[in-house]
């Protein structure tokens, strides 16, 4: 059986990267929450 996680740097950046987060309202909210919490790394 194939494992579910097949790492790809491109897919990772495109779905969870900073620009991907900034492109949607929900993504902007995610970043805002992470900044408010004080996360050192807000995106991948």
From Swiss-Prot:
Pfam families, per the entry: Ribosomal_L34 (PF00468)
Keywords, in A-Z order: Ribonucleoprotein, Ribosomal protein
GO cellular component: ribonucleoprotein complex; ribosome
GO molecular function: structural constituent of ribosome
One example of a Gene Ontology biological process annotation: translation
InterPro entries cross-referenced by the UniProt entry: Ribosomal_bL34, Ribosomal_bL34_CS
Matches recorded under Gene3D superfamilies: 1.10.287.3980
PANTHER family: LARGE RIBOSOMAL SUBUNIT PROTEIN BL34M, MITOCHONDRIAL RIBOSOMAL PROTEIN 34 FAMILY MEMBER
Family statement: Belongs to the bacterial ribosomal protein bL34 family.
Protein name in the entry: Large ribosomal subunit protein bL34
Organism per entry: Aster yellows witches'-broom phytoplasma (strain AYWB)
Highest classification ranks of the organism: Bacteria, Bacillati, Mycoplasmatota, Mollicutes, Acholeplasmatales
GN (gene name): rpmH
């Amino acid at each position: 059986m194939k494992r579910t996680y097949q790492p790809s740097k491109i897919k990772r950046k495109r779905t969870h990267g900073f620009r991907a987060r900034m492109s949607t309202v929900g993504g902007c909210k995610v970043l805002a929450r992470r900044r408010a919490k004080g996360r050192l790394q807000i995106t991948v």
